[in-house]
Amino acid sequence: DGKEYQAISAPAQINKTMNDSGKSFTIDAKITRGNGNLTYETTNEKIATVKDGKVTIVGRGKCNIVIKASETKEYKETEEKVTIKIDKGYQKIKVPVTSYKKYVSDKNFKLEAYVEAPGDGKVEFIANENDVVKVSKDGEVTILGPGTARVYAVATGTNNFNRDISDAIVITVEDKKSDPDIKNNVPSSNVVISFPSNAIQL
C-alpha cells in the first residue's frame, strides 16, 4: 500500500524503585515522523498501570509500556516499547528517642521505632554484646548492670524493600545515687579573725 511506518521517540528504559510506589510520571514520547495518535498500554498491571501516557508504579519487577501511533491515510500503525524496571526500595526507620540514661534499680522499659511509609518491613531490635542490658526483639529492655550499651532498630527485608538498620540507640546505666548523708551536709562555719587597728607592729 506504499504507506510508511511512523517514528516514535521514547526512552528505551525507565528505572524506578518501590519508594516511588503509588506515584505517577509521564513518559516523554512523541511522534517524530507521522501523524497518528499515541495510545499507551501496559503488559503487566501488577507492576505498572498507564493512562493517557501517565504511568503509576504498583509493584516490583519489569514490564513494558507499549506505545502505538494509530494508522492514518499516509502512515501505518507503528509500535514502540518502553521497559519499566522497578527495583526494591530502601526503608527509613524513625527512632523518636535515641539516648537513655537509667539507673541499675530502674524497671524494664520499651524502646520505640517505626518504619516510615512506603516501607513495609517489621521493626526488630538488636543489641551489641554487652552486660549492661538485655533487649528483646520487640524492644523491651531489662537492665543488667552499669555501663553503656548500643541498640539498633532493624527494618526487616521484604519482597519490595531492602533491610535497613538505624543509627545506634545509646543506653547509659549508672549505679543508683545514694541518699545524701545528712551529717556530711552541715555547712562549715566561716571563721573570721580580725585584728584591732592599733595592734603593735614589730
Describe every region a protein language model picked out:
Residues 1-202:
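Solvent-exposed beta-strand/loop surfaces, strongest in extracytoplasmic domains of secreted
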